[in-house]
């Protein structure tokens, strides 16, 4: 019998909750981000003008946020990783962690725990580098290279890209606007928004460049993973079949 849309939603929710129980890395990432965000409230500082443009950060962000200047001109390369676990405000971390909780488990289940973590971190690094690349190409004000960048958004957008490749026809119900989209349509929509913000130089164009970089990196990396799996699968089949060598039949016609 045909299933109604309500049945589809129930099945998706049931499957998602089942995936959540096995999403070990997603749970640890969410916990780590939340703990670091809370700790930041106890270490509030004002940034001197000769280090950054006038902004207000906490002490953890001061030594963990990414900027092109501090990372490459001062050699603090660890910022490519640490900035991914820092967030600007409550809304920022809530959006990212909800998205990680929603999209992350199915990708972790597909990739495995270790490979998922490496994928997550790689997309975050690619997001920062892509943002700096566009800045060096003149898309943003030269001051951009000094402005601290924080957030897991680049990694999250990379996970969205993986979902769009692996599960393109899965459905996403948005609350605002209240529309139902496939994961592929949703990924293309957020990709279009990020591109428009960069092209028209709207607010947070540099941050949207990071989103775009994370999504591009995730798309390419997911395709490479699938390609590698496709190449190795015939070898696994050959190896398994080589263990079985039936004896020739003793019967004669």
Where are these regions (language model features)?
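Transmembrane helix-loop-helix
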Residues: 16, 76, 80-163, 199-213
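Alpha-helical transmembrane bundle and helix-membrane interface signal
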Residues: 109, 166-181, 226-235
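C-terminal transmembrane module of polytopic alpha-helical membrane proteins
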Residues: 7-34, 38, 44, 194-253
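Positively charged, low-complexity/disordered segments
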Residues: 2-6
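Extracytosolic (periplasmic/ER-lumenal) interhelical loops and adjacent juxtamembrane/interface segments
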Residues: 50-85
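Hydrophobic transmembrane alpha-helices
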Residues: 104, 162-166, 218-226
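Helix-to-loop transition at the C-terminal end of transmembrane segments
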Residues: 38-56
């Amino acid at each position: 019998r045909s299933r109604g849309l309500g049945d589809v939603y129930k099945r998706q929710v049931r499957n998602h909750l089942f995936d959540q129980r096995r999403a070990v890395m997603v749970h640890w990432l969410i916990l780590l981000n939340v703990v670091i965000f809370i700790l930041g409230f106890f270490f509030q500082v004002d940034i001197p003008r000769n280090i950054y443009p006038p902004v207000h950060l906490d002490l953890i962000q001061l030594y963990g946020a990414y900027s092109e200047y501090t990372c490459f001109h001062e050699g603090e390369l660890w910022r490519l990783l640490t900035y991914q676990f820092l967030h600007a405000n409550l809304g920022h971390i809530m959006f990212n962690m909800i998205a990680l909780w929603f999209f992350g488990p199915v990708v972790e289940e597909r990739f495995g725990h270790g490979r998922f973590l490496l994928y997550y971190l790689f997309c975050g690094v690619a997001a920062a580098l892509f943002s700096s690349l566009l800045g060096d190409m003149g898309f943003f004000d030269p001051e951009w290279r000094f402005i601290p960048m924080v957030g897991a958004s680049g990694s999250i957008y990379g996970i969205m890209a993986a979902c769009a490749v692996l599960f393109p026809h899965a459905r996403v119900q948005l609350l605002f606007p209240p529309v139902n989209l496939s994961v592929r349509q949703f990924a293309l929509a957020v990709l279009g928004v990020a591109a428009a913000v960069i092209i028209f130089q709207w607010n947070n164009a540099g941050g949207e460049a990071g989103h775009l970089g994370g999504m591009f990196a995730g798309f390419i990396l997911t395709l490479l993973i699938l390609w590698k799996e496709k190449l190795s699968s015939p070898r696994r089949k050959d190896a398994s079949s080589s263990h079985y060598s039936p004896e020739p039949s003793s019967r004669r016609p």
